[in-house]
């Protein structure tokens, strides 16, 4: 248990959930977990119980008519958090209320519950499902009396109580139970961004500051894992600092002036075939040769294809991987889960202590996002990962064909610190590539388009020295982004 502001809290043991609760659940709270069948209420509660349970902190788990205890235990064995030793020593004790509810009613069930509490003196009590009591109560008055007396008695014993039920929005506004409880967690499941996702929302929790946003979560063999980038990926209050990064790419550093400020993120924007992936790979390869670790998150090309590209350009990228200077993380497009992989990227950058990070590409990573506001928020979170680690990030993005945008929605470039624009035009019987440093905050850089070639050895740039250097100042505070036509992103 932990203390915060003189309130004793119980750690849940669920990844990132304690962060949403600012340290854990206040001891003695009566909390309702509401949601439809299959949303994850029971697994979430059981994971908290087995994390907390010990000989000194016992758990009383009351099963009602919804599911017999034997079936509950059979399902529990699938999860790594399940520890049968805690059953053997009485740390977790299951009690079946089904028979007494069917034969004796609410009053006798309440008496049995409190008799068990006095006998066991638990730290946690669970009732799964509490909705059964609603169905058995003869009136709202009886239900209110039962719920109030039970809550008061359990609070007197400083017992943290979880009441699970298939409650919906109408129940929350009309059921008398919700007027006496301390906390309400909504657990739901629905389709979002083209995939079925589970969400948890902390609607109410007395005596504690907490996030009120919806946060996605998954159920795995380890149990429940909550993804909350709005809480866990927050930008630290720090400026770019004086340190600068030289890319090591031929002539690009001349365009960039004194270098890229540490903590900066650059959008590498262009249509298909303009050299975005090659630029990202060379950025990491040259960094590794200069002693800077780098990582690339690829959502399009597999590790093998990226290595083949590097070999074709004459780079021994495999050697840099073997000596721990470069890491390639491939996630296939159908497997992308934005919030989960945001946290994964944060952890991998931190664990590697990467000085350079590349994403290929943000347009594919966020391809299921249809709302420009959400797209902007996620790019901001990616940029925050880079700034907090004081690395330098190169984010490839596809420009929609036939538009003058610099990104998919036309809002991402307002979030990042710099934009490098890659283009190509027909000249004679071929195409000529160009590179332009469109913006780079706090850095005097060379303006205009400059010729670029991709050939053996990497990228070659031919600067036009008749262009003037320009300093990009930090912009004023951003206003809420307006919706732009999305257009389609070009495929590679």
Across the structure, where does each feature detected by a protein language model lie?
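Conserved P-loop NTPase
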Residues: 1-7, 118-120, 189-250, 347-353, ...
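Flexible beta-alpha connector loops of hexameric P-loop NTPases
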Residues: 4-7, 63, 95-107, 133-144, ...
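Pre-Walker A adenine-sensing motif
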Residues: 12-24, 248-259, 487-488
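Short glycine-/polar-rich loops that comprise or flank the Walker A/P-loop
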Residues: 28, 55-58, 89-92, 157-159, ...
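Conserved beta-strand position immediately N-terminal to the Walker
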Residues: 30-31, 265-266
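P-loop NTPase motor core
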Residues: 31, 106-180, 184, 278, ...
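Conserved P-loop
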Residues: 36-101, 262-265, 271-335, 489-492
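Conserved nucleotide-binding/hydrolysis micro-motifs of P-loop NTPases
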Residues: 65-70, 98-103, 130-133, 161, ...
């Amino acid at each position: 248990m932990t203390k915060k502001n003189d309130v004793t809290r119980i750690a849940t043991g669920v990844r990132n959930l304690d962060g949403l609760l600012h340290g854990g659940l206040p001891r003695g709270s009566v909390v309702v977990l509401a949601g439809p069948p299959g949303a994850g209420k029971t697994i979430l509660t059981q994971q908290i119980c087995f994390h907390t349970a010990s000989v000194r902190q016992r758990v009383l788990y009351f099963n009602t008519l919804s599911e017999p205890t034997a079936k509950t235990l059979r399902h529990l064995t699938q999860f790594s958090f399940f520890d049968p030793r805690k059953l053997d020593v009485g740390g977790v004790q299951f009690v079946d209320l089904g028979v007494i509810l069917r034969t004796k009613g609410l009053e006798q069930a309440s008496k049995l519950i409190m008799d068990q509490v006095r006998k066991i003196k638990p730290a946690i009590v669970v009732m799964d499902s509490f909705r059964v009591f609603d169905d058995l109560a003869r009136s709202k008055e009886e239900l209110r009396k039962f719920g109030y007396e039970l809550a008061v008695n359990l609070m007197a014993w400083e017992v943290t109580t979880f009441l699970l039920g298939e409650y919906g929005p109408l129940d929350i506004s009309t059921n008398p139970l919700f007027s006496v409880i301390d906390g309400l967690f909504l657990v739901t499941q629905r389709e979002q961004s083209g995939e079925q996702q589970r969400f948890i929302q902390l609607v109410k929790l007395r005596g504690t500051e907490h996030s009120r946003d919806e946060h996605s979560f998954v159920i795995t063999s380890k149990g429940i894992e909550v993804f909350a980038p709005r809480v866990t990926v927050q930008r630290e209050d720090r400026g770019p600092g004086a340190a600068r990064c030289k890319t090591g790419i031929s002539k690009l550093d001349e365009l960039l002036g004194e270098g890229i400020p540490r903590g900066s993120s650059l959008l590498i924007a262009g249509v298909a075939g303009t050299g975005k992936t090659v630029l990202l790979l060379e950025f990491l390869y040259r960094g590794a040769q200069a002693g800077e670790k780098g990582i690339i998150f690829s959502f399009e090309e597999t590790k093998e294809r990226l290595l083949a590209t590097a070999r074709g350009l004459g780079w021994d990228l495999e050697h840099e991987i073997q000596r721990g200077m470069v890491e390639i993380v491939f996630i296939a497009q159908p497997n992308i889960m934005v919030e989960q992989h945001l946290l994964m990227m944060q952890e991998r950058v931190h664990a590697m202590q990467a000085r350079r990070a590349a994403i290929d590409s943000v347009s594919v990573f966020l391809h299921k996002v249809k709302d420009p506001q959400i797209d902007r928020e996620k790019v901001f979170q990616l940029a925050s990962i880079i700034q907090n680690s004081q690395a330098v990030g190169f984010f490839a993005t596809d420009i929609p064909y036939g538009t003058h945008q610099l990104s998919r929605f036309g809002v991402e470039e307002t979030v990042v610190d710099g934009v490098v624009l890659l283009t190509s035009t027909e000249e004679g019987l071929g195409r000529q590539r160009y590179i332009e440093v469109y913006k780079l905050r706090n850095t005097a850089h060379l303006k205009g388009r400059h010729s670029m070639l991709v050939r053996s050895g990497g990228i070659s740039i031919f600067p036009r020295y008749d262009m003037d250097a320009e300093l990009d100042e930090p912009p004023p505070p951003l206003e809420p982004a307006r919706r732009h036509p999305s257009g389609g992103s070009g495929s590679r």
